[in-house]
Amino acid sequence: MLLMRLAVPFCRQNAVSSYLALSPLPKGGIFSVALAVSGTAESRCLVIN
């Protein structure tokens, strides 16, 4: 239970930070791949919780 509670803010912070880091980049192949990876990580966090 404690691990799940710690995972919630960590996942949200990770998703926000990755979005902010990628936002200034132009839309391209690397941007799409990184966005897909961050979205997958967010989905896994939501599934865990």
From Swiss-Prot:
UniProt superkingdom: Bacteria
Protein name according to UniProt: Uncharacterized protein TP_0495
